[in-house]
Amino acid sequence: MNNARPIRRALLSVSDKTGILEFAQALHAQGVELLSTGGTAKLLADNGVPVIEVSDYTGHPEIMDGRVKTLHPKVHGGILARRGQDEDVMAANNIGPIDLVAVNLYPFAATVAKPGCTLEDAIENIDIGGPTMVRAAAKNHKDVVIVVNAKDYDRVLAEMSANGGSTSHATRFDLAIAAFEHTAAYDGMIANYFGTMVPAHSSDECHDDSKFPRTFNTQLVKKQDLRYGENSHQSAAFYVDLNSDEASVATATQLQGKALSYNNIADTDAALECVKEFDAPACVIVKHANPCGVALGDNLLDAYNRAYKTDPTSAFGGIIAFNRELDGETAAAIVERQFVEVIIAPVVSQAARDVVAKKTNVRLLECGQWTAQTKGLDYKRVNGGLLIQDRDQGMVTEAELKVVTKRVPTEAELKDLMFCWKVAKFVKSNAIVYAKEGMTIGVGAGQMSRVYSAKIAGIKAADEGLVVEGSVMASDAFFPFRDGIDAAAAAGISCIIQPGGSIRDEEVIAAADEHGMAMVFTNMRHFRH
């Protein structure tokens, strides 16, 4: 093995002690001398693993309540020493080589995420010695192994066992990259935390304790290379946030089917996030990032049949998301009726897996069950910059709706208004959604004119033979003119939900009253671009 380096001395100092005892035992069995600190040293000693405390090794005690443990020339000289070049200096200063460093860092992210975390708590969980050792070992990867992730313990041990206690340069280099990624992410988290406490120099609007740091740092890890991007001439890859464990397309497990494409991932995200809005059994069918059919049902099969009925033409080649365990009967209805790119559900039953397995190209994903929506950020790339905002988790309750017309919505209309409003949140602006009895009747998406979105929703319903009469309508933003209300009335809409806020609200309300319609304002907009 070219550039092999034997491991004779290792320094182990970890906050997350997962697997460290077994790793230390295996290193000891291969004749490696072990150095360690604090809790790690105690864990090893308590379990009968011979270990030398770093303070005994350096001849200098830990000081300042443990703030200074490993910051010593015997430690860093041993890590940074260039084999074949620095031996005279090492001998003169009684420094021995350290061939392997296993370190993970104080749990800063977990600490600051805790309710009631103080600045002092955060400061005490900023690791100093750990990152210093990690960077030193990674810099000297020509001679030293650095391990920052417990999942790599077995990899290192296997290579040592196969090569007489030595590791290859390729392995050391790969682990060094992981180490620099680890420290970069760690420093980024700290910078983000402190960056929210000071005003950005470029804004007169900013204030202390902003949720947006003046310098934004994040780290995403490549999950997979994609065949191509949005179009075949664009290359692409899928990166994920390892700090997120929320049920999502990023954390989902693919059970079968072809590899996910760029567009599959984007559309699956849109479908899944929409279906999460509903408590009753629900199905969302998405095409080109827009819901083309959404419905509630007594069960998943009922919900799917009703969602499909909205727009069977657009559902062809679409993405289907559910908020319940996918059963065999529903899976059979899908694969027997239509061509589908992706099916995603929190859980997929064995019966459903067996059914979908007959269609080997269908991508079947299981994302796990979600509980409540978690706070997060949305990003939009612009040339030379990045727009960052809160994830749109705003939603009104029935009690918060403001009735602005003479006629008050019926109980049935109110239920449909709430359903329709949730769907509109996921339709590209300008968005108009018609719905009746927990089912979309028509969807008008992405038009520059709101009235044309309303017309398209009506056309869609007519094309599929769906009765608009008595349906409700949701608009993601206010109506600037009465023409949208007139178009809705002509189509048979009985009730409207919209944000309100136009300078012509009175004119719009008067139009609704003229048509005998009920209308409610949400005082909340749901633009989606």
Swiss-Prot record:
Pathway: Purine metabolism; IMP biosynthesis via de novo pathway; 5-formamido-1-(5-phospho-D-ribosyl)imidazole-4-carboxamide from 5-amino-1-(5-phospho-D-ribosyl)imidazole-4-carboxamide (10-formyl THF route): step 1/1; Purine metabolism; IMP biosynthesis via de novo pathway; IMP from 5-formamido-1-(5-phospho-D-ribosyl)imidazole-4-carboxamide: step 1/1. GO terms for cellular component: cytosol. Pfam families: AICARFT_IMPCHas, MGS. Its EC number is 2.1.2.3, 3.5.4.10. The keyword Transferase applies. GO terms for biological process: 'de novo' IMP biosynthetic process. Residues 1-148 form the MGS-like domain. The keyword Hydrolase applies. SMART domains: AICARFT_IMPCHas (SM00798), MGS (SM00851). GO terms for molecular function: IMP cyclohydrolase activity; phosphoribosylaminoimidazolecarboxamide formyltransferase activity. InterPro entries: AICAR_Tfase_dup_dom_sf, Cytidine_deaminase-like, MGS-like_dom, MGS-like_dom_sf, PurH-like. It catalyses: (6R)-10-formyltetrahydrofolate + 5-amino-1-(5-phospho-beta-D-ribosyl)imidazole-4-carboxamide = 5-formamido-1-(5-phospho-D-ribosyl)imidazole-4-carboxamide + (6S)-5,6,7,8-tetrahydrofolate; IMP + H2O = 5-formamido-1-(5-phospho-D-ribosyl)imidazole-4-carboxamide. Disulfide bonds: none annotated. It comes from the Bacteria. Keywords: Hydrolase, Multifunctional enzyme, Purine biosynthesis, Transferase. The IMP cyclohydrolase activity resides in the N-terminal region. NCBIfam families: PRK00881.1, purH. Belongs to the PurH family. This is Bifunctional purine biosynthesis protein PurH. The gene is purH.
